[in-house]
Amino acid sequence: MCVICGCNTNHETARQDENKGEHAPGRGLVDTGTEPPGAAHVRIDASTGDLHYGAGPAHVSVPGLSQARAIKLEQDVLGHNNRLAAHNRQHFVAHGVLALNLVSSPGSGKTTLLCTTIEALRRCRADLQLAVIEGDQQTSHDAERIRATGVPAIQINTGKGCHLDALMVANAYERLPLHAAAHAHTHEHRQEDGQHSHHHDHEHARHDHHDHRSSGIGSVLFIENVGNLVCPAMWDLGESAKVAILSVTEGEDKPLKYPDMFAAASLMILNKIDLLPHLRFDVARCIEYARQVNPHLQVLQLSAATGEGVDEWLDWMLAGGAAAGAAAATDGARMRIAAPEAGIAALGTQLAPGPAVSKEM
């Protein structure tokens, strides 16, 4: 997972811990009795030789890190991100912003779907304010495509990073007209020694005292995450819901290969269904696989190219489906991370300092 593999903001941590000698080789997890050099918590299939590096309580193996240390790092880093995400979510709810986190593999058609969705929303809900945050490692190509539709967009380039995080989204959102419109009025806040008023000109992610509410959806913020079916699954951005987009050109077993993403999603969109006549893609099997991972997952089939199924997508988005699906997806995601959290208790002794070593000879 990218919290500890080296692509997040704390990418030096694993190497630092490796230098400190905190790595504890896995015991009892190697089935054949023969452990590859430097391996930790790997399960080996005796009949095929296949390696499974997610066998430990942390569900990941990183050279230089014990399983307990890996879990602790994940909790620390994600805990900080989740606090920022909670601020984002509080703001979005207070101002009637429906924030959707679009996640998928590269090339699934996210940006094309966004352009089609923008056109459709303008026809049926011209009153809605729209904005887009684009995430890619490099270039502003996708943001330029969105801006060409007339909708404001901010491009986030993550460099070597493989996902967006809550602070990135907060910083990008502050630069959108959607944010300015939400804060066009002056907020009144009461303190113990009296009242004061101020305008929001500070970092939004750290603002936690909204005292007003908005009824219904007044605007939609689309967040197109970096194309990646692994890392974005565990990073809460403060969104109303995650929407996993799966192209029918990718194969129907993607939900089983990348279960964390589909467990965290409220909705799975099967895109490019106009290509089905030319492919051997079993739609029913794909949906079955996805619901093995997430029984509450809602599924829509559409073609961003032809517009087929887009009306159903808009209905889900604006008629409460996003909110209803988000609660179920949150429960599913919590179940999937329960094992690592429980595992840290069993591995607590690895985090405790060892006995002092006497310097006397």
From Swiss-Prot:
Keywords: GTP-binding, Hydrolase, Metal-binding, Nickel, Nucleotide-binding, Plasmid, Zinc. Residues 14-25, 189-213 have a biased composition (Basic and acidic residues). Pfam families: cobW. Zn(2+) binds at residues 162-163, 231. Residues 99-300 are annotated as: G-domain. Ni(2+) 2 binds at residues 162-163, 231. Coiled coil: none annotated. Ni(2+) 1 binds at residues 2, 5, 7. Gene3D superfamilies: P-loop containing nucleotide triphosphate hydrolases (3.40.50.300). One of its GO terms (molecular function) is GTPase activity. One of its GO terms (biological process) is protein maturation. InterPro entries: CobW/HypB/UreG_nucleotide-bd, Hyd_mat_HypB, P-loop_NTPase. Residues 14-37, 183-213 are annotated as: Disordered. Belongs to the SIMIBI class G3E GTPase family. HypB/HupM subfamily. Involved in the maturation of [NiFe] hydrogenases. Required for nickel insertion into the metal center of the hydrogenase. Exhibits a low intrinsic GTPase activity, which is essential for nickel insertion. This is Hydrogenase maturation factor HypB. It comes from Cupriavidus necator (strain ATCC 17699 / DSM 428 / KCTC 22496 / NCIMB 10442 / H16 / Stanier 337) (Ralstonia eutropha). The gene is hypB.
